Amino acid sequence: MKILVLGCNGMAGHMISLYFTENGHDVTGFARNKSRFINTITGDARDVGLLKGIVRAGKYDAVINAIGILNSFAEDNKSTASFLNGYLPHFLADVTADMDTQVVHMSTDCVFSGKDGGYSEQSVPDGNTFYDRSKALGELNDGKNLTLRNSIIGPDIKQSGIGLLNWFMQQKGPVVNGYTGAIWTGQTTLQLAKTMENAIANHAHGLINAVPNSSITKYELLKLFNKYLRGSSLEINPVNGVCADKSLIRTNFDLNYNIPDYETMISELAEWMKIYKELYPHYDIQ
């Protein structure tokens, strides 16, 4: 398949780009800076003329949108967040409306507040922050394009990344606190790439909560990180702290693909990270 990955240097984007390339697909990246491992077109995604020309000329099987303005940055840069999180996915859908190219968009559990939990594809987003609302605005739900809604965990090629795994891998210990009241559903970035590959090949479309059949606490997640990536060298201390249940429930099975359990996903991610260890010199992978 011929794939364009927007945001190919980000936490999700670099993994998606590398996975698709390693599995024989023709991958082009788009980012502000050149990727170290795939052919990259550099530019600003806010330059709609440039982006439209790239998408139209490339005649890709899929455009994967891995661009996102996150959390506090979205609060401080509302116009940029509105454009990239909310407008861009719909712009891409419009640009490709008369083409065979599918837009695959990444959404997040953060479109929900976490007050209730067990959110399905039919649940009405009730996130409180500007980031939450901008991501909800960007979700595509039509008969051609695909939105995969889930949280993600994975390595970051940037030491300054704000993801949970990036934070954990830089902890010196010996004790790390894990929240028992923070309920999570999602995928590793490696598994997300696999899910996308299957979805594109099988023309899945609409809005899909792309999660396993169960949830997990952040405390249990850290225990798995510790086991597979730090040689159980840290003590993970259970704490109450943050209580939020943004768990997702999948009811749309247009994507006929089962996402593995959390331990399987994290063990596979750990093996991948050990193979590509040179990408993550800021991690002490054991």
Q: What residues fall within each predicted segment?
A:
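NAD(P)H-binding glycine-rich loop region in Rossmannoid oxidoreductase-like domains
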Residues: D44-G86
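N-terminal Rossmann-fold cofactor-binding loop
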Residues: G29-S35, D44-A45
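Amphipathic terminal alpha-helices
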Residues: P260-Q286
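Glycine-rich NAD(P)-binding loop of the Rossmann-fold in SDR/ketoreductase-type enzymes
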Residues: D76, T80-F91, P125, T129, ...
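Conserved Rossmann-fold NAD(P)-dependent oxidoreductase catalytic core, especially the SDR/UDP-sugar
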Residues: H90-D126
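Mid/C-terminal beta-alpha module of Rossmann-like enzyme folds, strongest
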Residues: A193-D245, K277-Q286
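NAD(P)-dependent short-chain dehydrogenase/reductase
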Residues: N128, L140-Q191
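N-terminal Rossmann NAD(P)H-binding glycine-rich loop of SDR-like oxidoreductase domains
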Residues: I3-N23
